[in-house]
A protein has these predicted regions:
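N-terminal Rossmann-like NAD(P)+-binding subdomain of aldehyde/semialdehyde dehydrogenases
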Residues: 1-103
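Rossmann-like NAD(P) dinucleotide-binding subdomain of oxidoreductase/dehydrogenase enzymes
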Residues: 96-203
Length: 203
């Protein structure tokens, strides 16, 4: 390690969480009403942009984690694309409404705003496993990546923006688990939390 600076982030706080939750709730009103076809088109566009940024993602994770570049390419960045393709195929097969044998109708609906907390050791793997199914189902989300691997999360936010994810559907807040993580997991206007890591991450 050379201790050379590779990037700069701003650590968020409780106020930032409140702002992001408000934006996500506002965006949910419209995004939750999108069709499956709309969201499939969006996921496929995300796949295109992610493919274009594959090497940039791999380099970012290699630098922030200290991982060999071959691992960053073949295990880290590649898993992000693989998960995305899997969610596209799953959404294509998803039946949003089923009639049960007794005549009742089972309807699958987006749950609301999702708070997503990810660890340092598999950054894009974990980000895609949480962010993409939320988007696929019509939910909005707020991501808090590990403060130790923030660069790849920033790059992924740029990918989602370039792909056309609507404003407020995806929100990124950098910060510690003790502050931002706790604020997310305790927020009354977040309907679901997906958390991977130790309790230090914010539970």
């Amino acid at each position: 390690a050379t201790e050379e600076e590779i990037g700069t982030i701003i650590l968020g706080n409780n106020d930032d969480v409140d702002i992001a939750v408000k934006a996500a709730n506002l965006a949910f009103d419209n995004f939750s009403k999108t069709t499956k076809e709309d969201r499939l088109k969006l996921l496929k566009r995300i796949h295109e942009v992610t493919s274009d940024c594959f090497e940039e993602l791999a380099q970012a994770m290699s630098k922030e984690m200290g991982a060999p570049i071959t691992m960053s390419r073949e295990a880290q960045a590649d898993s992000g694309l693989g998960h995305l393709q899997g969610f596209i195929e799953a959404l294509e097969k998803l039946e949003e409404e089923n009639t049960l044998s007794n005549g009742d109708i089972l309807t699958k609906e987006p749950i609301g705003v999702c708070g997503l907390i990810t660890p340092w050791n598999w950054p894009i793997n974990q980000i895609t496993l949480k962010v993409l199914p939320a988007i696929a189902c019509g939910c909005t989300c707020i991501l808090k990546p590990s403060e130790h691997t923030p660069i790849s999360a920033m790059l992924y936010a740029e990918i989602l923006h370039e792909a056309g994810v609507p404003s407020g559907v995806f929100n990124l807040i950098h910060g510690t688990g003790e502050e931002v993580g706790v604020a997310l997991s305790r927020h009354p206007d977040i309907q679901m939390i997906s958390f991977t890591g130790s309790t230090r991450g914010g539970m």
